């Protein structure tokens, strides 16, 4: 997920994305602990996506003040 794509989305959609990504991360961690996850790099990718979305949210909130 590119930061440019994230940065143009509205705040409500970004908050929904964070919730969805956190749920996906939970699922991936659970699959990893049970040995069902073959592509463990997805955990890192989802964590980075969460960080990108949270950064965009922070920037939007800072700009609105």
Swiss-Prot record:
GO terms for molecular function: structural constituent of ribosome. Coiled coil: none annotated. Keywords: Ribonucleoprotein, Ribosomal protein. It comes from the Bacteria. Disulfide bonds: none annotated. PROSITE patterns: RIBOSOMAL_L29 (PS00579). GO terms for cellular component: cytosolic large ribosomal subunit. One of its GO terms (biological process) is translation. InterPro entries: Ribosomal_protein_uL29, Ribosomal_uL29, Ribosomal_uL29_CS, Ribosomal_uL29_sf. PANTHER family: 60S RIBOSOMAL PROTEIN L35/50S RIBOSOMAL PROTEIN L29 (PTHR10916), LARGE RIBOSOMAL SUBUNIT PROTEIN UL29C (PTHR10916:SF0). Belongs to the universal ribosomal protein uL29 family. This is Large ribosomal subunit protein uL29.
């Amino acid at each position: 997920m590119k930061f440019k794509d994230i940065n143009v989305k509205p705040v409500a959609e970004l908050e929904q994305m964070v919730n969805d990504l956190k749920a996906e991360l939970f699922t991936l961690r659970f699959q990893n602990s049970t040995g069902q996850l073959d592509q463990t790099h997805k955990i890192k990718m989802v964590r980075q996506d969460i960080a990108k979305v949270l950064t965009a949210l922070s920037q939007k909130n800072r700009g609105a003040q």
